[in-house]
Amino acid sequence: METKQVFKLTNEALQTHNNFQWTVGEWCEAPGTGELCSKGWLHWYHSAELALLMNPIHANIDNPRLFVAEASGAMRDDFGLKGGSTKLRITQEIQYVAPTTEQRVKFAILCASAVCRDKSFIKWANGWLNGSDRSCGEAWAAYYAAADAAAAAAAA
């Protein structure tokens, strides 16, 4: 059976959504039906970093435990943000350092930069990322320019 190394977050009791119980080394199976964000799939992340960065908007687990896992069977992917498979087992708990505020902001800017084409936002984002401009005034100006552009696009 071919497997893929992935990463899984659990709570302190090795549980995930709806108190699904995990045991290190034991395979769990799902039918592979429905949308990725459903009980038909076992969810995981491509990297430890992505698991920790996405936790607040996905599982929102307080004090998560992070595991290396093996995924197998049918697989689905959500544009690289998370994945799911029909077979999954957690194999080894790993220690981690939680992302810093700066790392979270950088990640958010990179995500927004992938879709926002507003020139003032891009200028500000590049300045923030390269460290040349991290001023609040420029951040607010970029925010308002992007909001105005979004409102104009929605009205069109």
Descriptions of predicted regions:
Residues M1-A156:
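Short, glycine-biased loop/turn motifs at secondary-structure junctions and
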